[in-house]
UniProtKB/Swiss-Prot annotation:
It catalyses: carbamoyl phosphate + L-aspartate = N-carbamoyl-L-aspartate + phosphate + H(+). Transmembrane segments: none annotated. Belongs to the aspartate/ornithine carbamoyltransferase superfamily. ATCase family. It holds the Pfam family OTCace. Its EC number is 2.1.3.2. This is Aspartate carbamoyltransferase catalytic subunit. GO terms for cellular component: cytosol. One of its GO terms (biological process) is 'de novo' pyrimidine nucleobase biosynthetic process. Heterododecamer (2C3:3R2) of six catalytic PyrB chains organized as two trimers (C3), and six regulatory PyrI chains organized as three dimers (R2). The keyword Transferase applies. Keywords: Pyrimidine biosynthesis, Transferase. Catalyzes the condensation of carbamoyl phosphate and aspartate to form carbamoyl aspartate and inorganic phosphate, the committed step in the de novo pyrimidine nucleotide biosynthesis pathway. One of its GO terms (molecular function) is aspartate carbamoyltransferase activity.
Length: 317
């Protein structure tokens, strides 16, 4: 028999639409609950019945491998009936609006909807039209809350804390929902955040988010405890932001020489998918300081914790 969870944390929100709005206590509660699921997922029997009788719909308007499969595994391990909705074969391809899709789905009474959409703010709009809980699995360049939570869990398990750490977020900050969610979370938890990118890949006024800004890797990685690399999101670019991939790697790609600017025990992170030889070298990505594979493992645990914490708030829970 699977032992009862020690954590009784309940997320005091109906939806998880972003890190913005979460308190330090909310984040700590989710991370503590996630820790229990890390241990459960390493056992032979990985099942719990927290979501038995509940319906979870994964609605992805953008292609995804890691996030969608991670949410599917998380839901099934909690006992939910999980449905993956293929947008390519859905009514939206035939002209149905996002709001019509939301109303149609709501008529089927799903308990939890996990939604990814290419437009910033689309997930929040959909959440207004449904009765169940909605989890933002990434909306445009806006937010990706579960990625920030799994990154925080990975850091905390390796460093023992978040407060006071120097975290360098490097690469295409302008188009990255991962960067935005991580900045919000890390600032809330007392870390020191530094963004490192060429000027063309930095949002205007990024300093107002409470970050330091560096425009070269030597300055940006100096004294860093965590080096978080971001890929070039060419699918969101409507022009040329870098001269070439080769030149970008020369100045901003993470290799062993640039990693040496950081602390000797710095962790290397990447949300995936990686473009080896563009933003990160294979030797570093697969090296002893890399926790990239661990991030994937933490993703399932975090998404189980989020589903559990929201389910505890559902009617008849």
């Amino acid at each position: 028999m699977t032992p009862a969870l020690k954590s009784t944390f309940v997320l005091a929100h109906r939806h998880l639409l972003g890190i913005e709005g979460l308190s330090a206590a909310d984040i700590t509660g989710l991370l503590d609950l996630s820790e229990e699921y890390v241990e459960l997922n390493r056992q032979v029997d990985k099942k719990r019945a927290s979501l038995r009788g509940r319906t979870q719909v994964n609605l992805f308007f953008e292609a995804s491998t890691r996030t969608q499969s991670s949410f599917e595994i998380a839901g099934k391990r909690l006992g939910a009936d999980v449905m993956n909705m293929s947008v390519s074969s859905s009514s939206m391809r035939k002209g149905e609006t996002l709001m019509d899709t939301a109303v149609t789905l709501n008529a089927m009474h799903p308990d939890i909807l996990v939604v990814r959409h290419h437009a910033s703010g689309a997930v929040e709009l959909l959440a207004r039209k449904v009765d169940g809980s909605v989890i933002n699995a990434g909306d445009g360049a806006h937010e990706h809350p579960t990625q920030a939570l799994l990154d925080a869990l990975t850091i905390r398990r390796n460093k023992g804390r978040l407060e006071g750490l120097v975290v360098a977020i490097c690469g295409d900050v302008m188009h990255s929902r991962v960067a935005r969610s991580n900045i919000l979370l890390l600032n809330t938890m007392g870390a020191r955040v530094r963004v490192v990118a060429p000027s063309t890949l930095l949002p205007r006024g990024i300093e107002r988010m409470g970050v330091e800004v560096a425009r070269d890797m030597r300055e940006g990685l100096d004294g860093a405890d965590i080096v978080m690399m971001l890929r070039l999101q060419r699918e969101r670019m409507n022009g040329s932001f870098v001269p070439s991939s080769q030149e970008y790697f020369h100045y901003f790609g993470l290799d062993q020489k640039k990693l040496a600017y950081a602390k000797p025990d710095a962790l290397v992170m990447h949300p995936g998918p990686m473009n080896r030889g563009v933003e990160i070298d294979s030797i570093v990505a697969d090296g002893a300081q890399s926790v990239i594979r661990e991030q994937v493992e933490m993703g399932v645990a975090v998404r189980m914790a989020v589903l559990e914490a929201l389910a505890r708030n559902l009617p008849n829970a």
